[in-house]
């Protein structure tokens, strides 16, 4: 943790005046004492260190809220505690005084308003006849006409968050999830009007999603306690179908006859397996094997198939930097044949049963049978793969003759009878009405309703969402956001004991500040203080809906400039760039640009630089815009020439790149080229790239310094550790080369040292722990924080 030090310039010595594991910060020197705040007693208080006696005393004794933002004018200290401002005069010896501050305000930021919410859509569900949609937007549920009619806000609850609205297949009700009671519950709204009905009561955790049974009698939901729960839509009675100790359930769907459900469940080997469950007998049966990851199961509307995706295509991609491989794009679309007498829909036509049911018209859905028959014995062996290239798929709908699915950002259809694949729409998602006649597309913030498409569709007129207007009352909304955040941690934090924190007491402590929140920034601050009590990493506060000012990017030249006495600007230094990266482009260092250090910039776009107080006023808005510079080797317009450059928006990457290059040179020089150096900026793609960029060319070094200081984190540190741990167990040689190779490839067997500091964060914090735990080498520097907790959905 931070300590406070005294530096003596004359003696060139330093003295640590705190030297403990607590956080000691913000020193203020007044007279013979140095005041600072410290959490050595768990709550941040004001302390004073006497420079004469060397003794430290505690000045304040707050036990509930931390002291925040102390500052001094050299005589008086002011600080904030629990939302109030206090003044402390060290000379008087009196207790800190609360300063009563009254600010007159019209409270314009937190006024009630009626807000258009068409840009905040989070979900939608089409009615069975496709004449209307239930649209969820910014915590409200709207009943919206597909073409013409009245848009109705059926919730109007600024103090609650409604979501996942779903129209019942019989068209009589809209179900949705609401936290208006303080917990997430399932609610029902009769489409003819009237008051909504709370269907579930006394729920004890976060409900993930809801799903109607095709007969409209039941509603399924999954929750954060890894349960599948079925609710009777009439009585509200509910039963827990199952609970999985190993993880949550995903993609739970009913069969057409409402007797079965299918879902994905993670196994002990972390492979997702698809199951069917008989709601009548209470028995569960596997659809897929544990050998392959499978997901997204849906029943075909005729009840003959379950369509799903599975990762079974093993197509290795070999690396160029080392002899290694990776598997990606392994997915395919599969069909499970539920009845053992059902033939594969992809059999050649001559091999099919010649007795066929009358064909439905192209625009008619296949009629569902009254009973879905599943022969559970041998079900995992009755799988058929659609002849599609490997990809990232998710099935949408099937009528038993065709399969509509998503691949990346496109919707496609595979005709099981013709064996043909058709692109339906790009840049869109699709859902299908309960009767299988209509499709709803969501694309670029707009909703479109069409007939169930059999060919490529041109999305024409979108559903008019402009009348979706929600009442916003921040005095109700902000406490709801606070409460939902508290519940999210209560239900989702990785340890049920909340790191030993009394989470109910913490809620009460910070909820007391909510009446004083007048902006979203205030709310975010309060939430941040609340979750900080858990002392864990990755506990973020998203800013929410706040007003921001668009920054006009400044054009920068990748150079250090100074003003000459003539009024022109001298180029003191051109920062070198790297040709392999556009983000490391240095405008004045690019080949062919006729300019050098020591030259002068006498005009920008024809405007003399002598006519401005600051040269950068001529570069406002010039980032990534072609700009004309007039330059000369002397501070004069006479003899000057013009060049065209493209200024950059940020010079930090250039400075960072050159800092790394200088470190490499320092290590090279200090070790006579025997030791390599790698700086890893983060544990994401950039950090992985930088490691690879400098690791493989330095495999000839005898030792290696890895620099993890100020690492921004990510998740790739295990990949780095794996490479650093490699030891050769076999050697290779060639008659025509003096080089000796190793198996495994790309090994550096010499000593390794890791540099760290307190800014090494997230996976950049885990990396030094792993480095030390695996015995890779010494770790040098100030300790990292060590409060790493991972992220999950």
Regions found by a protein language model. Name each.
Residues 459-534, 538-540, 563, 567-569, ...:
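Terminal targeting/pro-maturation regions of precursor/exported proteins
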Residues 515-570, 637-663:
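Extended, small/polar residue-biased N-terminal targeting/export presequences
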Residues 551-611, 685:
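PDZ/PDZ-like domain segments forming the peptide/carboxylate-binding groove
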């Amino acid at each position: 943790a931070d300590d406070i030090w005294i530096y003596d310039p004359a003696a060139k010595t330093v003295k640590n005046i705190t030297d403990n594991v607590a956080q000691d910060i913000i020193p203020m020197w007044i007279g013979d004492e140095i005041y600072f705040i410290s959490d050595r007693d768990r709550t941040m208080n004001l302390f004073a260190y006497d420079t004469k006696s060397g003794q430290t005393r505690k000045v304040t004794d707050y036990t509930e809220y931390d002291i925040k933002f102390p500052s001094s004018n050299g005589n008086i200290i002011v600080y904030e505690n629990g939302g109030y401002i206090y003044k402390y005069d060290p000379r008087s010896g009196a207790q800190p005084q609360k300063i009563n501050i009254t600010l007159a305000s019209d409270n314009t930021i937190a006024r009630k308003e009626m807000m258009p919410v068409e840009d905040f859509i989070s979900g939608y569900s089409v009615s069975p006849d496709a004449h209307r949609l239930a649209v969820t937007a910014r915590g409200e549920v709207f009943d919206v006409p597909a073409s013409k009619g009245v848009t109705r806000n059926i919730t109007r609850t600024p103090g609650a968050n409604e979501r996942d609205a779903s129209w019942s297949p019989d068209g009589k009700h809209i179900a949705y999830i609401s936290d208006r009671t303080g917990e997430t519950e399932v609610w029902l709204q009769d489409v003819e009007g009237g008051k909504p009905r709370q269907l579930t009561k006394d729920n004890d955790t976060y409900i993930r999603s809801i799903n109607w049974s095709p007969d409209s009698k039941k509603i399924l939901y999954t929750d954060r306690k890894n349960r599948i729960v079925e609710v009777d839509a009439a009585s509200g009675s509910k039963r827990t179908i199952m609970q999985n100790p190993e993880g949550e359930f995903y993609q739970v769907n009913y069969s057409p006859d409402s007797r079965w459900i299918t879902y994905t469940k993670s196994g002990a080997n972390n492979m997702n397996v698809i199951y069917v469950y008989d709601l009548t007998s209470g028995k569960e049966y596997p659809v897929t094997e544990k050998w392959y990851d499978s997901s997204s199961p849906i029943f075909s509307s005729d009840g003959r198939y379950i369509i799903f995706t599975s990762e079974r295509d093993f197509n290795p991609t070999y690396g160029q930097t080392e002899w290694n491989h990776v598997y990606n794009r392994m997915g395919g679309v599969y069909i499970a044949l539920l009845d053992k007498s059902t033939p594969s829909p992809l059999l050649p036509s001559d091999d099919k049963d010649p007795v066929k049911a009358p064909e439905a018209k192209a625009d008619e859905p296949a009629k569902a049978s009254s009973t879905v028959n599943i022969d559970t014995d041998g079900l995992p062996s009755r799988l058929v793969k659609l002849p599609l290239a490997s990809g990232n798929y998710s099935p949408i709908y099937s009528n038993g003759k065709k399969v509509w699915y998503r691949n990346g950002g496109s919707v496609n259809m595979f005709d099981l009878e013709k064996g043909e694949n058709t692109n339906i729409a790009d840049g869109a998602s699709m859902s299908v009405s309960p009767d299988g006649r209509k499709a709803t597309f969501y694309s670029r913030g707009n909703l479109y309703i069409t007939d169930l498409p059999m060919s490529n569709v041109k999305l024409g007129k979108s559903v008019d969402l402009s009348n979706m207007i929600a009442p916003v009352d921040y005095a109700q909304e902000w406490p709801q956001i606070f409460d939902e955040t508290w519940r999210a941690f209560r239900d989702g934090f990785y340890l049920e004991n909340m790191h030993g924190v009394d989470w109910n007491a913490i809620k009460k402590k910070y909820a007391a500040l909510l009446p004083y929140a007048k902006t979203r920034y205030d709310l975010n601050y309060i939430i941040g203080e609340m979750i900080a009590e858990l002392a864990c990493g990755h506990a973020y506060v998203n800013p929410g809906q706040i007003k921001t000012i668009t920054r006009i990017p400044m054009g920068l030249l990748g150079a250090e400039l100074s003003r000459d006495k003539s009024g022109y600007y001298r180029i003191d230094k051109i920062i070198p760039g790297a040709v392999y990266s556009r983000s490391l482009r240095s405008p004045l260092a690019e080949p062919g640009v006729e300019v050098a250090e020591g030259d002068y910039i006498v005009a920008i776009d024809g405007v003399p630089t002598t006519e401005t107080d600051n040269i950068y006023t001529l570069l406002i808005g010039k980032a990534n815009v072609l700009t004309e510079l007039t330059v000369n080797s002397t501070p004069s317009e006479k003899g000057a020439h013009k060049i065209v450059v493209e200024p950059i928006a940020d010079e930090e990457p250039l400075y960072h790149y050159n800092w790394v290059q200088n470190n490499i040179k320092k290590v090279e020089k200090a070790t006579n080229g025997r030791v390599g150096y790698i700086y890893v900026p983060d544990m994401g793609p950039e950090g992985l790239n930088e490691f690879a960029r400098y690791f493989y060319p330095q495999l000839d070094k005898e030792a290696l310094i890895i620099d993890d200081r100020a690492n921004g984190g990510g998740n790739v540190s295990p990949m780095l550790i794996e490479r650093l741990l490699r030891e050769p167990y076999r050697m290779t040689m060639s008659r025509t080369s003096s080089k000796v190779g190793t198996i495994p490839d790309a090994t550096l067997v010499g000593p390794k040292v890791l540099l760290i500091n307190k800014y090494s964060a997230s996976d950049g914090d885990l990396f030094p722990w792993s480095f030390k735990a695996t015995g890779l080498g010494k770790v040098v520097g100030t300790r990292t924080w060590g409060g790493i907790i991972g992220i999950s959905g």
